[in-house]
């Protein structure tokens, strides 16, 4: 790595772990490090797991998984095994291990597929299924238009009502329901969005949280009522509410602002922090800036 870039990576890493900096700015530093990649960026991200913000640590694990770099495996294993970490953080570490997809982690994932925390257990079960599917389908084309590494490949089915039926069938294996979920996302359009939004009413917390995530990716205004309703359900798992808040920020329709602003003082830290970050994303989506994680030209100026 060139000396100047290495210096900027170091500066971004320092910003990332500085609890005195605004959380949206730290998020921008994180996503810039993810985009830069490499061992030094991974090391910088890995140092953030001592933070007090579960939301930030969750995003650290997410980014490490999206980077698909084996050098992130040690820190992700450690986070998954650390029962002092919040369930949503451990879950994301397990999902990231599945995203990297190295069969080396199968034994560990099978062990934690029996974890007493249901969100962690289900995540590890999905990760095992994903890696095993990849082993059986090594040449399967990547048809994901969103460029994300997903916890399950999309189903081959293209009929929205059929996919909706699978998605909402709680007797169906979770991996198959996830495959229907990502197929609906890839198909897109209002019918698919509304089918997915129906999933916010059923299933476990992990399932509903993933629904929120994919609706955020789709950025369709038809998802706003369902996401807003989930955010407003105080009895809902904070893991779900936070994902719905981030999705509303990604959609960036004017109707999203009201819901987000109503919860910037929420009693759940992860929810109010998600609303803070989501409002920053909303500003970006409406600003015309080229890239949200524009750290090298803007973020470093604020360090």
From Swiss-Prot:
Its cofactor is Fe(2+). Pathway: Protein modification; eIF5A hypusination. Binds 2 Fe(2+) ions per subunit. HEAT-like PBS-type repeats lie at residues 56-82, 89-115, 176-202, 207-233, 240-266. Belongs to the deoxyhypusine hydroxylase family. Its EC number is 1.14.99.29. Residues 139-158 are annotated as: Disordered. Gene3D superfamilies: Leucine-rich Repeat Variant. Fe cation 1 binds at residues 58, 242-243. InterPro entries: ARM-like, ARM-type_fold, Deoxyhypusine_hydroxylase, HEAT_type_2, PBS_lyase_HEAT. It catalyses: [eIF5A protein]-deoxyhypusine + AH2 + O2 = [eIF5A protein]-hypusine + A + H2O. It comes from Xenopus laevis. One of its GO terms (biological process) is peptidyl-lysine modification to peptidyl-hypusine. This is Deoxyhypusine hydroxylase. Fe cation 2 binds at residues 91-92, 209. It holds the Pfam family HEAT_PBS. Signal peptide: none annotated. It is an enzyme of class 1 (oxidoreductase). Catalyzes the hydroxylation of the N(6)-(4-aminobutyl)-L-lysine intermediate produced by deoxyhypusine synthase/DHPS on a critical lysine of the eukaryotic translation initiation factor 5A/eIF-5A. This is the second step of the post-translational modification of that lysine into an unusual amino acid residue named hypusine. Hypusination is unique to mature eIF-5A factor and is essential for its function. The gene is dohh. One of its GO terms (molecular function) is deoxyhypusine monooxygenase activity.
């Amino acid at each position: 790595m060139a000396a100047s870039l290495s210096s900027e990576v170091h500066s971004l890493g320092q910003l990332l772990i500085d609890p005195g900096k605004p959380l949206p700015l730290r998020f921008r530093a994180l996503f810039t490090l993810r985009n830069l990649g490499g061992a030094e960026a991974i090391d910088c991200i890995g140092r953030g797991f001592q933070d007090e913000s579960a939301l930030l640590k969750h995003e650290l694990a997410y980014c490490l998984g999206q980077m698909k770099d084996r050098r992130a495996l040690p820190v992700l294993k450690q986070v998954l095994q650390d029962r002092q970490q919040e369930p949503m953080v451990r879950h994301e570490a397990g999902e990231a291990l599945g995203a990297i997809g190295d069969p080396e982690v199968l034994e560990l994932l099978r062990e934690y597929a029996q974890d007493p925390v249901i969100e962690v257990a289900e995540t590890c079960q999905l990760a095992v299924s994903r890696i095993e599917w990849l082993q059986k389908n090594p040449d399967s084309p990547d048809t994901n238009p969103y460029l994300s590494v997903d916890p399950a490949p999309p189903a081959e089915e293209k009929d929205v009502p059929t996919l909706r039926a699978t998605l909402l069938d709680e007797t169906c294996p979770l991996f198959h329901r996830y495959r229907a979920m990502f197929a609906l996302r890839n198909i897109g359009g209002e019918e698919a969005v509304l089918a997915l939004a129906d999933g916010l009413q059923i299933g476990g917390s992990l399932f509903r949280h993933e629904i929120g995530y994919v609706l955020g990716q789709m950025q369709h205004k038809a998802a706003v009522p369902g996401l807003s309703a989930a955010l407003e359900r105080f009895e809902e798992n904070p893991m779900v509410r936070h994902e719905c808040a981030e999705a509303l920020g990604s959609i960036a329709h004017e109707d999203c602002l009201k819901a987000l602003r109503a919860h910037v003082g929420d009693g759940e830290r992860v929810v109010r922090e998600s609303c803070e970050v989501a409002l920053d994303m909303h500003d970006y989506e409406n600003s015309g800036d080229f890239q949200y994680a524009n750290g090298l030209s803007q973020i470093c100026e604020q360090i």
